[in-house]
């Protein structure tokens, strides 16, 4: 038999572990590891490759992991975890198979190499299946693993029985994920010796502690030389400076929009996927980021932490307070380039500019009607759904929009002046065109005397409305009454026999 050009050794087919990784394995997993490694060793010997030292066999037989030295531990640690989501990933598999293929090219008549390659693939696949990390659907994964293990445990074509057919399957939930193991190892290797004297929080590096202490002192040592804005930490300044340079390295693959931060890209991508992981526990409404949920919860709690120092009005968001304060200062920094109109908020400018461009980006899926603002679309869609979420607390009537409800509530706020026989005065209520109600008091009137209202209703055409009055035909000097008749289109104005107020409705000049 012709020897291969390159010798295949046991460490080429071994799955290496660090001590911390080995401690995470259950006894059944360690047993399967030992059997797989011994099987690989047997395949090497049967294929004619150089065998390992007896020390290796002794360690495997005692159930200890095959570890070369500290340098190998570091190399294996970085390679095994290269593929996220797999606890045990044998990245040397292709290299080993390539060596086996080279050996087979030199030994075309020898069948042991084919068996060795097949068994190696079989052992690697069996062990790799048990190295999968836990997914969100652990029950489905376990079922899938059991099926794959059963198929992998079928005897090979040469009639040999698989040594793992009767072994208890691995439970993937016993294994940890890459991030958990890395965090565990990092914590053990690096001591957090730098402790904050204010809150007791510990840090690995002194510079991290210094940045943290700035939060307590309020100091912002990292200042932008372009706009003067200061930051607690240097990386915050670096991200801020990208804004001045126009550098947005994170691009959305769906729409091409770019972002300063990766976190901003992650949040934006949820607008494409429709994912809303932050759910309100009160009403069930979902949000794409936690900050929006925090602001929304203030609607339920009534909390308004941002208060205007000028008028005391409260707001749920700081941006709303800043926009409100511009009313007091008179500043309107956002100017429309078309008509020169100034607005206090940037979003207000964007909406206003759509009136010039005719853009209506929010389209109804039912009838195709477009709207400038999303709230307009939401209210419009309630026409199709029949939803009327705003209910009047006075009469129970429901409305599609809050603004319509507010107008309706004004009808309940109109005060009716009831008659009062005890009152020494009479009231005349004048309803103006602009719907403002004016109440005017008149001195008490003697019975059987006409009401002189020419001064009150001069130059106006009026119609007498209200409760019926007792007709009274005046006697004596009727010159004043004649003037009143002319003013009131020949309608007799008399003093009511019971009530002492008269309601006049102004119909025009």
Swiss-Prot record:
Zn-finger region bounds: C2H2-type: 194-216, 222-244, 250-272, 278-300, 306-328, 334-356, 362-384, 390-412
GO CC annotation: nuclear matrix; nucleus
Membrane-crossing segments per the record: none
One Gene Ontology term of the molecular function aspect: RNA polymerase II cis-regulatory region sequence-specific DNA binding
CDD domains, sorted: KRAB_A-box
A Pfam family annotated for this UniProt entry: zf-C2H2
Alphabetic keyword roster: DNA-binding, Metal-binding, Nucleus, Repeat, Repressor, Transcription, Transcription regulation, Zinc, Zinc-finger
Domain of life: Eukaryota
GO biological process, one term: regulation of transcription by RNA polymerase II
The keyword Transcription belongs to this UniProt entry's keyword annotation: yes
Location of the KRAB domain: 8-78
Keyword match Nucleotide-binding: no
Subcellular location(s) per record: Nucleus matrix; Nucleus
Family: Belongs to the krueppel C2H2-type zinc-finger protein family.
Subunit structure: Interacts with BRCA1. Interacts with RNF11.
General function of this protein: Transcriptional repressor. Binds to a specific sequence, 5'-GGGxxxCAGxxxTTT-3', within GADD45 intron 3.
UniProt protein name: Zinc finger protein 350
Organism in which the protein naturally occurs: Bos taurus (Bovine)
């Amino acid at each position: 038999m012709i020897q291969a050009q390159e010798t295949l050794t046991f460490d080429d087919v071994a799955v290496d572990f660090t001590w911390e990784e080995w401690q995470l394995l259950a006894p059944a997993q360690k047993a399967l590891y030992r059997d797989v490694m011994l099987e690989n060793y047997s395949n090497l010997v049967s294929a004619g490759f150089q065998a390992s030292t007896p020390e290796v066999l002794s360690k495997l037989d005692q159930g200890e992991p095959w570890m070369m030295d500290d340098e190998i531990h570091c190399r294996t640690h970085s390679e095994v975890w290269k593929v996220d989501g797999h606890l045990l990933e044998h990245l040397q598999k292709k290299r080993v198979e390539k060596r086996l293929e080279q050996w087979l090219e030199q030994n075309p008549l020898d069948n042991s190499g084919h068996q060795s390659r097949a068994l190696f693939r079989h052992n690697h696949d069996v062990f790799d299946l048990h190295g999968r990390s836990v997914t969100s659907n652990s029950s489905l994964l376990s079922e899938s693993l059991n099926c794959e293990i059963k198929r992998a445990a079928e005897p090979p074509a040469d009639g040999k029985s698989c040594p793992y057919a009767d072994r208890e399957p691995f439970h993937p939930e016993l294994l940890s994920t890459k991030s958990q193991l890395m965090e565990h190892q990092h914590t053990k290797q690096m001591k957090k010796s730098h402790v904050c004297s204010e809150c007791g929080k510990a840090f690995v590096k002194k510079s991290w502690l210094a940045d943290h202490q700035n939060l307590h002192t309020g100091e912002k040592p990292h200042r932008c030389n372009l706009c003067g804005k200061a930051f607690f930490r240097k990386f915050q300044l670096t991200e801020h400076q990208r804004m001045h340079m126009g550098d947005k390295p994170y691009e959305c693959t769906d729409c091409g929009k770019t972002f300063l931060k990766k976190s901003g890209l992650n949040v934006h991508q949820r607008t494409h996927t429709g994912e809303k992981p932050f759910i309100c526990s009160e009403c069930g409404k979902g949000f794409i980021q936690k900050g929006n949920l925090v602001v929304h919860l203030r609607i339920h709690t009534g909390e308004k932490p941002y208060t205007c120092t000028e008028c005391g009005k409260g707001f749920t968001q700081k941006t709303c307070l800043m926009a409100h304060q511009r009313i007091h200062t008179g500043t309107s920094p956002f100017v429309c380039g078309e008509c020169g109109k100034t607005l206090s908020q940037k979003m207000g400018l964007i909406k206003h500019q759509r009136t010039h461009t005719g853009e209506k980006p929010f389209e109804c899926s039912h009838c195709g009607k477009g709207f400038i603002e999303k709230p307009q679309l939401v209210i419009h869609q309630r026409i199709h759904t029949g939803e009327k979420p705003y209910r009047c607390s006075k009469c129970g009537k429901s409305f599609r929009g809050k603004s319509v409800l507010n107008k309706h509530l004004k009808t309940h706020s109109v005060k009716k002046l009831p008659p009062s026989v005890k009152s020494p005065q009479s009231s005349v209520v004048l309803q103006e065109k602009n719907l403002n109600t004016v109440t005017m008091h008149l001195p008490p009137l003697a019975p059987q005397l006409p009401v002189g209202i020419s001064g009150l209703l001069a130059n106006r055409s009026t119609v007498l409305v209200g409760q019926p009055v007792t007709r009274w035909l005046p006697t004596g000097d009727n010159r004043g009454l004649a003037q009143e008749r002319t003013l009131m289109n020949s309608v007799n104005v008399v003093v009511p026999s019971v009530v002492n107020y008269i309601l006049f409705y102004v119909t025009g000049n």
